[in-house]
Amino acid sequence: MKKQIFSTLVFAMCLILPFSVYSQEQRKKVGVVLSGGGAKGVAHIKALKVIEEAGIPIDYIVGTSMGSIVGGLYAIGYTPEQLDSMVRKQDWTFLLSDRIKRSAMSLTERERSAKYIVSLPFTKNPKAAMSGGIIKGQNLANLFSDLTMGYHDSINFNKLPIPFACVSANVVNGDQIIFHDGVLSTAMRASMAIPGVFTPVRKDSMVLVDGGIVNNYPADVAKAMGADIIIGVDVQNALKSADKLNSAPDILGQIVDLTCQTNHEKNV
């Protein structure tokens, strides 16, 4: 992770001279690309800080999965320091669950919560019970909604303080879905809906999951937006060896990472 951030710093310093020579109108446009990579995506925050300290302006920011969250929040004005503080103070055990805060529970719900460690839904409709993921992600969705206060309407992401885009995958047909507009928190949630872990986001006739499946390093999206120079932060997971594939989640994660790697090579 540190090596990746250092590489970004070196590249950033190589770019700083041209920016000091050319006027604002003449300089080339810079796009920052933040890959998916689970918890390692926190490294994106440090990379953004390095870019800022190098004095390099960011004209576009594009992300997938965790990169979409960091990128989306940065695009609306959060600083790296604010993002780092936000990450540190969160109760991630709560966020990555479907638990309800005890303060929001009724007395009956509190008693039931104290009795049972796990709660599974039983219904006559199996489709209703199988929502497509272990975690519905409502707590995360609530956090995203709180963090994007003021951007809850359907908006054009090109009109944000920094033009932004993120990637999701439509599992109905395998298409790549690029969010250039819409509700920001919904776009971020759709981009990080890891199959089998988080429930997909249903929008119109689409069923949207983690964008890493189709484009984990969307440099092509940044170029299409107008970026002449790409600063990429790649924190994609390395493939596991056979001795580390010992559970269903391990194997599912490996399948996702294999798909991500195949598509990633096209953009590097």
Regions flagged by a language model, labelled:
Residues 5, 21-64, 72-268:
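Patatin-like phospholipase
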Residues 1-3:
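N-terminal secretory signal peptides that target proteins for export/translocation
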Residues 8-18:
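Bacterial N-terminal signal peptides
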